[in-house]
Amino acid sequence: MSDHLLRDEHQENVQPRKLLVPVGGRTVLGVLQENHRGPKALKVSKPALQQTQVLSVNHLGVNDENYGKIPARKAASKQPAFTIHVDEPDCATNKRKAVHKKTVQDENLQQLNSVLGSIGTRKPLHPIQIAMETSFGSPMDVSIVDEEQKVVGCNNVADYAKEIHTYLREMEVKCKPKAGYMQKQPDITGNMRAILVDWLVEVGEEYKLQNETLYLAVNYIDRFLSSMSVLRGKLQLVGTAAMLLASKFEEIYPPEVAEFVYITDDTYTKKQVLKMEHLVLKVLSFDLAAPTILQYLNQYFQIHPVSPKVESLSMFLGELSLVDADPFLRYLPSVVAAAAFVIANCTINERTWSDPLVEYTSYTLETLKPCILDLYQTYLSAASHQQQAVREKYKAPKNHAVSLIIPPESMSTFL
């Protein structure tokens, strides 16, 4: 190896020049004072070199031919301080690795072939004996189903039906509006309230809201008007806020606030609707889970099963009672629901209140008679009523067109 190569390989033994040290170098973690003596440690004094040579001589054996001879100083200076290991070229190493890898792959391939040969030929699977036109139901299926599916509500649990009914009977007293509140309103009348409820029925149909949402909204309106005086210009705002609250409480996907602003023909702003919603919540003390006529009807249908037509007629009569505050605010929702059930059952099946329902509700026909007569008069005058949204709603085939059914001539034969 030439002196030039030795100088290149031994650059770490050459004292660094001052120009190689940067002025503003990177600061080492901590100030290590001992490490600043590095350049001085590279200088080797002559006595130290001679001592190294003597030590190397003393290590020779006695029988060695060079024993006792001191090598020339010039020759010692040419000997390198340590030997340098030169790695083999990368191409040779890579070649050996490639050969070894190929050998391992060949061995693995031979083992795999032997295993597959021992397994033998795979037998085909037996065909499933199912007709190709057979379809499996999917929870994501959104196809139209001709058969009407009955929705089971959370209040229709048979094991807890009695406890639920008892709880609802207690809550309906707490959430009952004042019967004569309209007489204390200085600027609105019962006819204005009827127009508002009729409009809410149309809103519910437009956005395909649940019937329960309508019942809750009317309950919120009546309870709010029982405590607060409202100007006629703000009555629709109260109804809009009540419908918004009921939608949030009952619907899975309630309409946005902007939708309610739109249906008022931009009469009110979004800020006004939200502010009224906040006021309604404060007046109602955040008690939104009010029992409704529809909840009681569903319970009565569980105790005394009837045809879908009787169910639709009962719900039609229940919604008719929402339009006029007088006289139906005098009755509890459970009583109005029972009266609607009796009239519908008498109209279609010519039957009245059954014994299981008497035992379940503790209501007798004699107890229900005043409400039955009031609701029957409303049923008779439904076709000539000024507000027709409920009647139009129940003309639809999905509701069995029960609003077109002619009411019985008299209820006295059934009572």
Swiss-Prot record:
Tissue: Ubiquitous.
Regions that span the bilayer: none
A GO MF label: cyclin-dependent protein serine/threonine kinase regulator activity
Database matches in InterPro entries: Cyclin, Cyclin-A_N, Cyclin-like_dom, Cyclin-like_sf, Cyclin_A/B-like, Cyclin_C-dom, Cyclin_N, Cyclins_cyclin-box
GO CC terms: cyclin A2-CDK2 complex; cyclin-dependent protein kinase holoenzyme complex; cytoplasm; microtubule organizing center; nucleus
Subcellular location: Nucleus; Cytoplasm
Protein keywords: Cell cycle, Cell division, Cyclin, Cytoplasm, Mitosis, Nucleus
Biological process annotations from GO: cell cycle G1/S phase transition; cell division; G1/S transition of mitotic cell cycle; G2/M transition of mitotic cell cycle
Family affiliation: Belongs to the cyclin family. Cyclin AB subfamily.
Subunit structure: Interacts with the CDK1 and CDK2 protein kinases to form serine/threonine kinase holoenzyme complexes.
Cited function: Cyclin which controls both the G1/S and the G2/M transition phases of the cell cycle. Functions through the formation of specific serine/threonine kinase holoenzyme complexes with the cyclin-dependent protein kinases CDK1 and CDK2. The cyclin subunit confers the substrate specificity of these complexes and differentially interacts with and activates CDK1 and CDK2 throughout the cell cycle.
Protein name stated in the entry: Cyclin-A2
UniProt source species: Xenopus laevis
